[in-house]
Swiss-Prot record:
The gene is HLCS. This is Biotin--protein ligase. The keyword Translocase does not apply. Changing residue 505 to R: In HLCS deficiency. Widely expressed. Mostly expressed in muscle, placenta and to a lower extent in the brain, kidney, pancreas, liver and lung. Residues 43-75 have a biased composition (Basic and acidic residues). Biotin--protein ligase catalyzing the biotinylation of the 4 biotin-dependent carboxylases acetyl-CoA-carboxylase, pyruvate carboxylase, propionyl-CoA carboxylase, and methylcrotonyl-CoA carboxylase. Its main location: cytoplasm. Monomer. The lineage of its organism: Eukaryota, Metazoa, Chordata, Craniata, Vertebrata. Coiled coil: none annotated. It comes from Homo sapiens. One of its GO terms (cellular component) is mitochondrion. It holds the Pfam family BPL_LplA_LipB. It catalyses: apo-[methylmalonyl-CoA:pyruvate carboxytransferase] + biotin + ATP = holo-[methylmalonyl-CoA:pyruvate carboxytransferase] + AMP + diphosphate + H(+); apo-[propionyl-CoA:carbon-dioxide ligase (ADP-forming)] + biotin + ATP = holo-[propionyl-CoA:carbon-dioxide ligase (ADP-forming)] + AMP + diphosphate + H(+); apo-[3-methylcrotonoyl-CoA:carbon-dioxide ligase (ADP-forming)] + biotin + ATP = holo-[3-methylcrotonoyl-CoA:carbon-dioxide ligase (ADP-forming)] + AMP + diphosphate + H(+); biotin + L-lysyl-[protein] + ATP = N(6)-biotinyl-L-lysyl-[protein] + AMP + diphosphate + H(+). Residues 463-652 form the BPL/LPL catalytic domain.
Amino acid sequence: MEDRLHMDNGLVPQKIVSVHLQDSTLKEVKDQVSNKQAQILEPKPEPSLEIKPEQDGMEHVGRDDPKALGEEPKQRRGSASGSEPAGDSDRGGGPVEHYHLHLSSCHECLELENSTIESVKFASAENIPDLPYDYSSSLESVADETSPEREGRRVNLTGKAPNILLYVGSDSQEALGRFHEVRSVLADCVDIDSYILYHLLEDSALRDPWTDNCLLLVIATRESIPEDLYQKFMAYLSQGGKVLGLSSSFTFGGFQVTSKGALHKTVQNLVFSKADQSEVKLSVLSSGCRYQEGPVRLSPGRLQGHLENEDKDRMIVHVPFGTRGGEAVLCQVHLELPPSSNIVQTPEDFNLLKSSNFRRYEVLREILTTLGLSCDMKQVPALTPLYLLSAAEEIRDPLMQWLGKHVDSEGEIKSGQLSLRFVSSYVSEVEITPSCIPVVTNMEAFSSEHFNLEIYRQNLQTKQLGKVILFAEVTPTTMRLLDGLMFQTPQEMGLIVIAARQTEGKGRGGNVWLSPVGCALSTLLISIPLRSQLGQRIPFVQHLMSVAVVEAVRSIPEYQDINLRVKWPNDIYYSDLMKIGGVLVNSTLMGETFYILIGCGFNVTNSNPTICINDLITEYNKQHKAELKPLRADYLIARVVTVLEKLIKEFQDKGPNSVLPLYYRYWVHSGQQVHLGSAEGPKVSIVGLDDSGFLQVHQEGGEVVTVHPDGNSFDMLRNLILPKRR
């Protein structure tokens, strides 16, 4: 064993002595490590010079001698080469020196280095060929400052630790804010269970041996990069490193960063060429700079991006470097900034950027994939039990009595595809499957960060609807959970299913409904007599639910100008620009009663990859210097159900004309001209809804045509009414 280990001076130990580590000490250190969240390597770097964004402020900051910088390092780790990472060079020694030993696969040594080992250094993976690589020994100061949880991390094929290092310039509040912005967008693109994102400060970048344990270096600062740090970054590239530059002064390979005042903080149209030569067009926020080729050129890589303007300004370049696979993708558009950034000044710019937000993520993922990272969809979360909750205390006892009479001998209520097993408590050993889900009846055991029962109770002002709640953190789809209950439960119990996430959400025509955390997801059970105003006009149900969502937000005092709209037949929109939610209705006629499941989902807090209600509130506050508070999903679901019950009552009492004025106030189609069937189809003008809830359009010849929502869809981008794909 001794001859497989090396110490700092290159010697091998004569003897290995086992040391007993006390469990109490180990647990204390692990607890301290796990409680840290910020991935900061060093506290205070040296300040750097900042490059001004004026016309000449970034002229010719490219390095025009890549040959001198791109040479392969000739000396191995431990040499005194100036191109080697700082901290890896030979250290001077006196007559008495202490050299420290570390086995690469030893977690205890890493996590106890402060209390047990004076200074742990890396054991070379090359010198321990048949021991497993352990990336937990990535930086000597990690255990001192912060150390992420290491369980379940995926080892990548490069043999390097899965570290993504973010360099954002000098140590300042502005830089810290930039770090959080960049970290947030990268965490949305890659699997954070497979990669660790660190804040790389200047002192640490110069001193620590990070280059051997870095999969990707992200440089996101407009400040000039000190020469010694620049050389460090180039040495990393020459060793096969990968670099992503985000609106940064960093460049090489004959490319120069030059400023162009007309582009500064403006929204431009970008044409991005992917590795397969396909193109993506999107609106982007320009940094005010562009890339120009200098006298020395390198062959460009597979990715390119230019503005759709007369000069076709180069904004994204892909530059290979060296002979060991080093490469960089450098950008002068703000892919790291959300549309809600303070840099975005006007509502028009916000709309353009939000409309391209999904494509912004598409471009980022393409870049990260090209640089060797995995941007696969995150693992589907495990299903969780349902909790049976009640919004009114007086309904709890009758509910439990009803359940006692209707469950079978195994405590289950079964439908064709699903069994609900009612239990007083849940233990994690019980398997949860899409076909068998436990329902916990003990309300005292319930707690969730995504659903506050008290907030829901306070804002639910109904006589029947939404009184009994089935809540799940993660469930396949809320639409199936009431199959075995919808024909049996008394009307006064008002069943609703609410979920924080769905793994198999459904939309119209079998479309998949993406349901991340931050959506308000619910399925509500209502019953409508066949021989009633609404029973004779069932298509109106989806319209009532859509308008209930909009009214639930816009009827809040001071929120009346939040630009939520309804789009025929079943969507909730931001203005006429972007979908923010939708409604799905399934109805079954049994005897003289329609039993209707209304599925509804709309984005409340999840800004990415598209848009959410709180984005609209943030933008409204910015434009009007207001201080409207962000909203919660549980709060809004309660308000939606309350508004819906009121609309149903008005409809039943007075017919469709009692609710149509509210519907028309919020819908996006008034006077709109569209084509039926295809772009070559007949041109018509939208009139409104007929007495049955179907869309009426006026043809040029004078004929009024009715379009049924079941089987047709409205394409807002092309002004078409098309058959719904199935």
